Every structure is written in structure tokens, then in C-alpha cells.
Amino acid sequence: MEKLVIVGAGVAGVNAATKLVDNGYPGELITIIDMGKDPYNRKPAEVMEGFLGAGGWSDGKLTYHTAIGGHMSKYCGEEKAMELFDEVITNFKRFHPKPEEVQCSDPQAEPDFIKPYFGLRLFPVWHVGTDYLHEIGKNWYDYLVSKGVHFHWENKVNAINFRHGEITMRSVKPEFANMDDDYVLYDRLIFAVGKSGIDFGKKLSEQYTFPTEPKPVQIGVRFEAPQHHFQKLIDISYDFKLYRKFDNGVSLRSFCTNNNAAYVAVEQTYGDVSYNGHAKKGEQYRNDMTNFGILMEIPGIENPFDWSRELVQKVNKTWIADQGIKGRNAPKIHSGLYYSPSRKVGVTSEGEMIDALPIDSLDPVREAFQGYYSYIDDFIEDMKKVFPTLGDDWGVYVPEVKYLSPEPLVDYDNLTLAEWDEVHFVGDALSARGITVSGAQGIYVAESVLGSWKKHSYLLEQGTGDIF
């Protein structure tokens, strides 16, 4: 029997494991390794690692269109991609404590009032609700454990030997800092790291020199303002995506829009801070705010991953919080920046001040963005024309970033590497940028694994089976 290891317990890896055990694959042959914690021990602030990854700790919105969130249809066609999306959405409903509250918004018509300045991408979105993601995670995790799936939590994979099917990992727990590495052997590997593992995927790409496709830089800000300024558009498209493209190939889009009970969230990746957003379901969380990312896609930059990391480091600062404590004991905060013509830094859904250093001028941000911030300036100015009450009643948290390393070229039938047919890449490791696409890629790979496993089992029954 084949030992399968999944590196990354995010949406892609978890959906893959679920598809496998649902169809009889022995759970005791599946091992999942993740830097984070199980859903019972994962804290709200741990948004990047842990069961269901960043996607399962986000805004709880599942986009339902093949043109959004990364590649799926290019591998399997439109019809199959939508079938896989349905399966991802079904899984979230299946483990949801109140599945009847999962609803779909499906805007149909682009309003005339935005057309002079923006395009509006219209597509269906399933709303799971941030409030329920934790319970979904617990239910889903319990199911996989009940099927025999083994998890290695708080372990970081630092090397993979494709030739010998060997994974090297080490505990990230401080009390085990001096312990030796652990090793796990596999017959088949699903590499399903999230954003916090993109640097490791890049390292593997360079080590094994597998062919890749360059990806553009994706970086910008998290924009926040009172919801009433955008209500006219929200009534048409709840999760609106404004879009602009320029002649030099640079494009901008708003994305991950949160309304009603909308909060800016802090993400920590590679020791630096960036921002995202999420929305709560409960009326007790209502703050009548809207936030969304304004993200630039910049093609043609050499080493886009390194370029993005350097920019993020430039707009991260360590500063002393004004909490009445002086001297060496004064608390220090490492964060990104916050700029607003009129507003103060917001609070989290837990009522705590968002970690962001207020600045009086965007000049240091413009310098760090090396001239590209002018596109965001223009985007905001045009929003003020489309939404005339907006004026100076807004703020931006800097930066928001989607780390993308060069995308490995894979076999379209099973997402395996060209020279390593037992190694599959899925999720952020394959440039997925959304929950639905990540989950769909995981299920797609699982279907391939199941096909091989069932064929192998049949051959064994006939007395002719040997290896996959």
C-alpha cells in the first residue's frame, strides 16, 4: 500500500485528504504535516498556519467562477472545474454547524455609474461566514482523525529528497529547539503549502531546476471606510471587484470585500506584517465598515518573490506603543503602516487596536513602492469620483501582499511535476489565490491518486500487482 504525505494542512491538502478517505483510501496511510496547530489549539491571531490554513481563517467567502482565484479550468476544462468547485462548497457546508446559513450572492448587471472609471467583475460568491470557520475546522478535523489520518502539528518541513522519497522536518516548538530533525518517508507527495511556505517552494524549484512559469508581483494595500459610502454598489454586488488595466500591463483590482461587520486582520509571514480582511456574521460584531484589498499586478519584475519581500520589509517598522510604560520595558510592536487623511487606526473584532503604525504622509510608502504607488493613488481618486461621499473618510493599511513564486509546470491530468510523477503541487504552491481553487486542485489530485490506487488494488487481487 502507498504511503501518502501532504505538506500543508490548508484548504488544498485538507480537501485532498477528505476526497481520499471518503472513497475508501486508508486514512492510516495519510500523513499531513503543518507548521501550525490543530483547530482546537489554533488562536485567532494565528491566521497563516494551522488546520485549513489562511483560507480557513479568512473572510469565509468562496468565489464560484473559473476566472477568479487562480488556475483550475486550464488543467481540466470549465465543466470539470465547476464540478470540483461544487465539491469544495459542499465540503464547507458538510462540516458547517449551520449549513442553512451558507448563502450565495450572484450579481447580474454592471451598473452604469462605475463604467467611466472601473470595470466590475461579476461572479457568484458563497458566504460561509468568518464566525463559523473555527467550528467548521473542528468538525472537519475530527472527521479526518476518525478516519485514521495522522497529523504532525507545529513541524516545519525544511528539506524534501524527491529521489529517495524522504521529508526532513523539525518542531517549531521552543522547547524542542535543540532536538534533531525528524524524517518521514513517502511513496506519493502532495505539496500543498500556503503563503507561508512559498519561499520553500521556491527553494525546491531552484534545487531541482524544474521548469516554471514566471508570475507577476501582486502587492498593494487594505482599504477601509464606512460602509455607507459604497452601499449603492454593495446592493448590486456584495463582494464587488473593481478592476482597471493600464497600457504597460499593470492592472489593479479591489478584492476580498468585507461589509457590515468588517474588520482588518494582521497577517505575519516570514517575520513581517501585512494586512487582510474578514467579516463576521453575528449582529453583535456589526461596525458598519467596509474593507477590501487594492492589489496591483505588476508583470515583468525579475525575482518577483524577492522584490515583494524587500518592499514589505521597507514598510514594516518596529515602534514603541504608547501604553504608559517607559524605558526598556515599554512594549514594542512590529507592524506595517496606516495612513488616513481623517481617521484613526481601527480595532479588531476582539476590540483591540490593530497593529499598524500611523503615518502623516504617504511619501515613505511611495518611495518603497518605487513609483508604482501612483497607480493606487489614482485608483483611490477615481473611487472618490464614483462614490462622491467618500472624500477623505478612508484609510489604508500598508502592505497587502500575495506572495507568488514561479509556478511549476505540471502534468494537466494530475498536477505532477514533469520529472517526478509521484509529486503533486496544489494550492498556493501552484499559484492558486483563492479558497475554492485551492480546494478544487486538492480534490483533482485526489481523484488521480484514487484512480491509481484502485487500479493497483485490482492488480493485486489478480495476482499481477507490483507497484503504482
Where are these regions (language model features)?
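Residues forming the flavin
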Residues: 2-66, 106-468
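Dinucleotide-binding Rossmann-like beta1-alpha1 core, especially the glycine-rich loop
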Residues: 50-103
